[in-house]
Structures are given as C-alpha cells and as structure tokens.
Amino acid sequence: YEFNKGQSLDGSVSLTNHSSHRGHVTADAVRFGGGMGNIERAEAGEEYQKISGLPRYLEGARYYMHWAGVPYSIYSTKDGENDYADDINARGHGMNHMARGSDFVPNDTMPGLGVPLELAIGVHTDAGLRNNMDIIGTLGVYTTQYYDKQLATGMSRLASRDFADGMLAQIHKDLTLHLGNWTRRSLFDRNYSESREPQVPSMILEVLSHQNYADMLVAHDPYCKFIIARA
C-alpha cells in the first residue's frame, strides 16, 4: 500500500549492508501493518457491494482469508449468506487448513498447507459490570464433547482443558504479582466454534471485561498488555 514520501524524516525505511557478515540485502517492497480492507461485500438486504474502508486488522477473519487466497469452502460455510457465522467458523477452519498435513493435524484425504501449528487460542474480552472497583477478570472456555472427544492425532480433547487451565493460571499469577490482585474466573466446557473446530488443543480466552472500569484500566495499560501477552 503506497504512502506519500517526504512527510517526515522519521517516517522512512533505510536498508544498509553494513554488517560483520557477508551477504546481500534486498527489498522488493516494504509493508507497514496489514493494509486496508479490500474485500467488497453487500450489507444485509442490499445488493450493492462495497469495501469497509477500515484497516484490515479491524475486519473479520472471513475477509482476511478471502484476501489471502484461502479456498472458498474454508471461509464460507453459509453459502455467502451469513458473514457473521462465516467469520466465527473461518477461524477454526482456517487454522485446520493451515495445519492439515503436519504432524499435529495428519490427514490423507483433505488438502492442507502442512504448517505445524500446535495450539489455537481465540483472544476475546467479556461483558460484565461492577458498581465498585472490583475486577471481573479472566475466563477460559474449551470444548471436549465433539468429534469423538478426540483431536486429529487421537489425543483426548481434555488436552484443551489443560491448555486453558495453564493459561488462566499464568495470567493470574503474573497480573497478581504486578497489580497485587487479579481475578481468576471459571473454566467452562462449552460448545463454541473457536474452541470446538480446531483439531489441536484450543481455547477461548476472555481476558477481561470491556464493560467494567477496573478491568479497562488494565486493558489500557501497555505494561499490563505485555504481561498478558507474555503469559
């Protein structure tokens, strides 16, 4: 995506071959971020298709996979009639498509990209409100009661519970160490696409409540974001 030159001396990219090692430095293009959305879709009840006008990171997974060249059958499971449902399902299906053919998602009947992806996590924020400065905190969701309770390798889907439990424990430990207090909420075995469809251990992480003031103080703290991401 092109941008205008000469706006700022700091807004530039420099390539140099000054190094203690022999070799070559080349760059056909330089990209900042994911670019702008360019997938045309019609809103419900309309025939006219248009692009969102938003950066791609603010769009859904369905549109990213479309742009990235993922097969239509992976990102569209509702015949193009329900982008909301497609977006939810595309996350797990897209992950399986990338990993299929690797040691973690072995499959001889469906094509895949063979990328060795070991885990899948859907990072969310939850709703919920307190009338004081209490923290609502972090919740984990996993799914065990589908696909014969097994993952692609034959491993029990209880591995997803272990994954979710470890994730919540680490976030709780690290944020409590930094803040002095953090709330670890429940682990739920529930039927959600993002925790059901991936054929590797997977979970949905509800990091905090986007509706609660005390949680959002943490959400807007760059160091807390780092702690959560590291955990």
Roles of regions detected by a PLM:
Residues 26, 53, 57, 61, ...:
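Stable alpha-helical elements in mature extracytoplasmic
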Residues 17, 34, 64-72, 96-106, ...:
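Sec/Tat-exported extracytoplasmic proteins
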Residues 39-136:
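Catalytic-core regions of hydrolytic enzymes
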Residues 13-24:
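Short beta-strand-plus-loop segments that form exposed binding edges in beta-rich domains
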Residues 20, 44-52, 77-85, 147-158, ...:
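Second-shell loop/turn segments in exported
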Residues 9, 33-35, 122-149, 178-231:
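Active-site-adjacent mobile loop/cap segments within catalytic or ligand-binding domains
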Residues 156-188, 196:
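Active-site-adjacent substrate-binding region
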Residues 1-8:
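Extracellular carbohydrate recognition and processing domains
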